[in-house]
């Protein structure tokens, strides 16, 4: 009998999770989900305008201030995720391409965290500096890189011995 593990998968809020406009990370998550042994207890969260979602387990997180210069869309996304899932008690929270989402949620939610890097970590807020990446290595339960190139970029200016941490 398989252990029941409840998983929240959080897409970047700019990532579209629809058949008509899916982007790379959304397609990767959808394909990965199809073969997961935990697909009955895995919920995918994102901010998508369309309704033709790639999978039935998708839950939309609305963001009102998406283009606001006065407030943080990331903070609103995280706050709305917390509000929507406050009684869910996820065992694992998977975050795709958004180290800042991890930094926010880690302060508010007790769970194991996994970050997936699909793109250059040195171009993302929350993982640009060596200190930010060291902090992630120390605080995230697992970091997954979708390519060797992305992994090499993450460890740029860091001790290569940390790759096996």
Positions of predicted regions on the chain:
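Membrane-proximal helix-turn-helix segments that form the acceptor-binding/catalytic region
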Residues: 31, 82-83, 126-143
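N-terminal strand-loop element at the rim of the active site
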Residues: 11-19, 31-72
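A short, active-site helix/loop in glycosyltransferases that binds the activated sugar's phosphate group
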Residues: 134, 140-164
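An amphipathic, basic-hydrophobic alpha-helix
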Residues: 67-92, 128
